[in-house]
Amino acid sequence: MISPGPHNDFENYGGVSSRVGYHADRKRIIHFNLTHLSGVGLHAGGDLPFMPTVGDLGRSPVAGKQAGSYVTSKTDKEAYASSFEEERAGAGWYEVRLKDSGIAVSLSAAPRSAIARFRFPKDQAGAVVFCPANDVKGIVDSFLRIDPEGHRVSGWADTGGFSDAPFNPKKLPYRIYFTASFDAPFQKYGIWETAGRRDGVAAAQGPAVAAFVGFDSAGASEVTMRVAISYVDAAGAEANLAAEAARWDEPELRRRTRVEWNERLGALNLAGAPEADRRVWNSCLYLNLLHPNYFEDADGRYRGFDDQIHRVPAGEHFFANYSIWDTYRSTGPLQALIVPREAGGMARTMLRAAAEGGGGLPNWTLNNNETACMGCYPGATLLANLIAFGAQGIDLKEAHLRLVASATRKRPLKTYGGWDALEEYEAQGFKPRSASETLEYNVSDFALARFCRRVGDESNAERFMRRAASWRKLVHPERRGIWARQADGSWLEPLTPETGRGFTEGCAEQYLWFVPHDTASLLSRLGSPEALRERLSNFFDPFLIGGWNASKPKYWCGNEPTMGAPFVFNYLGEPWRAQELVSRVAATFTDGPGGMPGDDDLGATSASYLFFSMGLFPYIPGVGGFIITGPRLPYIDMTLRPGVVVKIRASNAGPRNPYIQSLTVNGKAYRRTWIDLETLAANGGATLSFAMGPEPMRSWGSRPEDAPPSPGSEIKLPPGYEHVPVKPNLYRDLRAQGNPSSAVTQMQNPDLSSLEPPLGAANLLSRAPQAIIRVIGPRPMNGASEGMVPRLCDGLGAQNHDDPSRCAWFDGGSGRLVMDLGLTRTVSEVRCYSWHRGNRAPQKFLLWGAQGPKQPEADFTNAAGSGWTLLADVNTEKLGDGGAHLTRIRGKSGGSLGDYRFLLWITPEAEQGTFFTELEVAGP
């Protein structure tokens, strides 16, 4: 639960940001925090900053805090920053020397508490500064109390958020409590507010307060702080301290951690490997044991997803921080294999969260909040994987109830635990405009089907197997690829390998290979084996390491959607190619800074390294088994449970010998490229003996019967299942009924400072204060009040991308807006602004005009005789997703658009709603 460590990176300062607060290239430690997450893709953690220092404490850590701002300034945050040297770390501890102040800092962690030791320079007055406001995400409120008699500092911070800058800690809120006990008396103490320092004041509350305690320079030069946290209450923090760090000194705490770490290492024991490989192996295993982490206090209490206090049974844990879209692929199976008792607790936590949240299984949890990050429904896949790979103590009846209920009900607005677009998905077989989420839904459905079959629910097993086959509806028969479809069944353009439209964190070619439950059927629809081998070889040449490569139609080894792509070669009769690729990918992991090809995403990437190095990979979600690719390391013992040990032995293993020459399982020759977990676990555990070599053994594993299974092909589908009829589309029909009378200029990421509203005297809205914008429907518009959307004509642009306080958008995308200018006026130009980080920035609408005095009916289906004239047909999608978009609509020959009182925007059906920030109308 606690994870103390250094913080030296904020909000893209320096051009590159670490979302967890530490970057090896940074030269100064800003402060230390009590919480961190491992390799998370968005800013999280970084709670309760503190910093030891020396001197007169003349700098305020909150002086620059602006009213209404959640985050303090960079200057404030770095008020007591220091350059550093002599960093050292091990399992559960960290040490560093702060060069500017000369302070040696040592941190050691227990589950809910920590010991911090500060060795101050001789004859210098040391102090420790506490500043909750300098949380990387900002805070809403905080409280600090100093107890000089008891040598304690305690308090809490209200924070939250899970995003890139700018931050909003009011979203996904939580309160974190702390208490810190010192072994030296306070010579001085006080607090800071934005107005300045107040010595001798023992308490402060607010979003911009800090506290300090100072020590006698003539006394002990070494001061120890014992600190604990709680998400329940202040008493919980005190009890956690008493149960853990208060009972031990630093050597004893480290000894206990070392003993536990060695036990964990024994579950995945490595021998005979070079030291650098051992460091990478141990580091990746360590990262996979950090999350999900304990969230309950020592007395078993925890704050649930309903924000109420609950208690787990004795010996049980409530886990927090699941990056499920990432971790179901690798971390979940690994944890079920090597820590099955804890993995069972993680599954039980998911079931508790579902019950407390009133919904289904969680998706991406941060503490006791569901972030709904990454969409899809991966909770079902993770739970099925935990069960399939051996997690212990899971109530299968409760799991079955939650899984089926969640998979068969629509997700309620602003909650989680159901399937988004469920009605469309069940009726049509795909989620409109999202190929990647359809593919992910299929994977979850397949895992659900396997689970239902396990518990004897054949009816739902067949239902979910049929749903899992709907990826077939996204395969373009002529272009031989997978793309998204619109709600009417038409294809979502463009149909190119690099398009990201309809794909999450990837493009069409990256997601093409992602049908792990039915890879053989996928390949049969994409071309001949010879053509596919060439296409797949080109996909990996070159493969991409690091950076953001979502729009590049190549293998991106640092991101999850392509994690299983190398193993497709096993289905094409060339497993030796997969062996080479997996060895090359594993070689991108090093024991230095930046030693991982992408975000770790709470263990997902590091778990893939462990599986790659073992020569086994859990390719098919929900199925307890592995694709075989050949180990990189010579001697691995994987203990599944007491008395069951899988032994992996690989002669000549290493980066220069990536190819399997032969394999025996328990002494018998084995040529298949798949092995079941049941086989590995039988009779006390199997022994896999590989002979590795520098040249491919093309005869091994290359027969059709050697290929891995493709269990999704078991379902019998009706004739014509893959055919998708294209329905009538009102938006498309209306487009065809008019001839736009305008010239349209489209810009992406323009310099909005030079185009910011208002237009001045040319802005008709400034001359027509009675101008209004009304929502006609058919869908509600976020940002509307009683059908009006004044924020779209208030002369104010958005402050940043994805700003819901300044933007308005239709749920589902389809809707109509009418602007009434009060009088018929000459309109020379219409400007439309939008701003969003993702696929809601592009603008897609039809603009119509009508004269007064009475507004024609806006809900028309036939333009002829409607009273409306089509002025513009706008689609800025070709500019790409993300950023700021501006559309300028003017007369074709530089003249006016015409004389109009009413302007009508029609947005298309089943589109995600554009984040409009402002609509402007200019006159002569």
Set out the residue ranges of the language-model regions.
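Accessory carbohydrate-recognition regions in carbohydrate-active enzymes
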Residues: 1-439, 452-473, 479, 484-510, ...
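Extended extracellular/luminal ectodomain segments enriched in beta-structured repeat modules
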Residues: 125, 813-814, 822-829, 898-900
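Disordered, acidic Ser/Thr/Pro-rich linker "stalks" and the adjacent N-terminal cap
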Residues: 719-824, 835-840, 872-883, 918-924
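Short, surface-exposed tryptophan/glycine-enriched loops
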Residues: 882-900
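Short coil-to-beta strand junction motifs in C2/discoidin
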Residues: 631-633, 655-659, 838-846
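Short beta-strand-plus-loop segments that form exposed binding edges in beta-rich domains
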Residues: 905-912
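Non-cytosolic beta-sandwich-type ligand-binding/adhesion modules
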Residues: 825, 833-879
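Exposed low-complexity, polar/acidic, P/S/T/G-rich flexible segments that act as propeptides
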Residues: 706-715, 827, 913-924
